[in-house]
UniProtKB/Swiss-Prot annotation:
GO molecular function: chromatin binding; DNA-binding transcription activator activity, RNA polymerase II-specific; DNA-binding transcription factor binding; RNA polymerase II transcription regulatory region sequence-specific DNA binding
InterPro entries tied to this protein: HD, Homeobox_CS, Homeodomain-like_sf, KN_HD, PBX_PBC_dom, TALE_homeobox
Region listing for PBC-B, in residue ranges: 137-243
Organism whose genome encodes this protein: Mus musculus
Protein name as catalogued: Pre-B-cell leukemia transcription factor 2
CDD domains per UniProt: homeodomain
Subunit structure and binding partners: Forms heterodimers with MEIS1 and heterotrimers with MEIS1 and HOXA9. Interacts with PBXIP1.
Domain PBC: 48-243
PBC-A: annotated span: 55-134
Originating gene: Pbx2
Sequence positions bearing Phosphoserine: 136, 151, 159, 330, 395
Length: 430
């Protein structure tokens, strides 16, 4: 802007300044009659004022086309103009009138509760703040919740958890640093711009602080999105590596084999004693409570669908019979049958052991001829096979009216069925 923005001084030494821009004829800035001070009548009423306003508007429209050097030159001319203090005082008066409405609308906004929750979670997981082993603490807590010591597999998984948590922490801090850097750069740019404008128009320090808070609120949306995505990544990581319920759900194949073998060999009374539970827990590498829960669930599933588990019972019957036959190969007397026999399905030996011919073993191979001959020898005339008379090694036991298990009146080693598989009730005991 040049001197024309503030209005040229009137001819003849009249009052100059802002009042002359767009003054009407007969006003305080022009003599009556709209002519020259000398009394001439050649002037057009209001013509010069309209021309000045048109020139000002034209200059405003061309501001965006100015180069940086031209803008600096015009800014310097404005600051050096003799009417600059008067213009600044007028702007201050206008600001005082409108300042009340600005102050009344300015209120301190409370901290977002969602942002506080995200910050607390990131601190608890060891992602935000100084690294104090938050991931290790979370892994240890999950291991304690699983109800047992830390096995080698668990220790490997916990090591993977800590490694991936460190990656999440690194990504979070690097992105947060980029966000803070961008926010600081933009805030600095705005503050420099306001300081430069304060030389032309009144800008209070409180207004600068308010503008900084507005900028931070705008950037806080990016910060919240970053923290929320980081929390989601941590929760997914915890569900994959530290879910205690998933650890309790799966047993190893060897542990399941040991538990099933005990269950079907004690099918007449599948309630292991505390000593037996401790022994099974030691063999399987699990806790006593897990053994109790497994037997309770197994009894319920077996009674609800006895036909489904008949094939599984037959497999364990074959295993037991083969082990008995191998143990009695060197003796002339018949082998001793299992102490607590009984199974969900019938298994006819027919006294000769011919049924084992051509039957695949548990691992997919056929039984050797030596084992078959040994079994025939042990199941020969007058032996255990004739005693049961083509009966069953394992047979379903009677079930009490209240749904419990009942011992048969026959000897504990060999029994015959008294009730078909259809008579099944749900097990309500533990």
């Amino acid at each position: 802007m040049d001197e024309r923005l503030l209005g040229p001084p009137p001819p003849g030494g009249g009052r100059g300044g802002l009042g002359l821009v767009g003054a009407e004829p007969g006003g305080p800035g022009e003599p009556p009659g709209g002519g020259d001070p000398g009394g001439g009548s050649g002037g057009v009423p209001g013509g010069r004022g309209k021309q000045d306003i048109g020139d000002i508007l034209q200059q405003i429209m061309t501001i965006t086309d100015q180069s940086l050097d031209e803008a600096q030159a015009k800014k310097h001319a404005l600051n050096c103009h003799r009417m600059k203090p008067a213009l600044f005082s007028v702007l201050c008066e206008i600001k005082e009138k409108t300042g009340l409405s600005i102050r009344s609308s300015q209120e301190e906004e409370p901290v977002d509760p969602q942002l506080m929750r995200l910050d607390n979670m990131l601190l608890a997981e060891g992602v935000a703040g100084p690294e104090k082993g938050g991931g290790s603490a979370a892994a240890a807590a999950a291991a304690a919740a699983s109800g047992g010591g830390v096995s080698p597999d668990n220790s490997i998984e916990h090591s993977d958890y800590r490694s991936k948590l460190a990656q999440i922490r690194h990504i979070y801090h690097s992105e947060l640093e980029k966000y803070e850097q961008a926010c600081n750069e933009f805030t600095t740019h705005v503050m420099n711009l306001l300081r430069e404008q304060s030389r032309t128009r009144p800008v209070a320090p409180k207004e600068m602080e308010r503008m900084v808070s507005i900028i931070h609120r705008k950037f806080s949306a990016i910060q919240m999105q970053l923290k929320q995505s980081t929390c989601e990544a941590v929760m997914i990581l915890r569900s994959r590596f530290l879910d205690a319920r998933r650890k309790r759900r799966n047993f190893s194949k060897q542990a399941t084999e040991v538990l099933n073998e005990y269950f079907y060999s004690h099918l007449s009374n599948p309630y292991p004693s505390e000593e037996a539970k401790e022994e099974l827990a030691k063999k399987c590498g699990i806790t006593v409570s897990q053994v109790s829960n497994w037997f309770g669930n197994k009894r319920i599933r077996y009674k609800k669908n006895i036909g489904k588990f008949q094939e599984e019972a037959n497999i364990y019957a074959v295993k037991t019979a083969v082990s008995v036959a191998q143990g009695g190969h060197s003796r002339t007397s018949s082998p001793t049958p299992p102490s607590s026999a009984g199974s969900g399905g019938s298994f006819n030996l027919s006294g000769s052991g011919d049924m084992f011919l051509g039957m695949p073993g548990l691992n997919g191979d056929s039984y050797p001829a030596s084992q078959v001959e040994s079994l025939r020898h042990s199941m020969g005339p007058g032996s255990y096979g004739d005693n049961i008379g083509g009966g069953q090694i394992y047979s379903p036991r009677e079930i009490r009216a209240n749904g419990g298990w009942q011992e048969a009146v026959t000897p504990s080693s060999v029994t015959s069925p008294t009730e078909g598989p259809g008579s099944v009730h749900s097990d309500t005991s533990n």
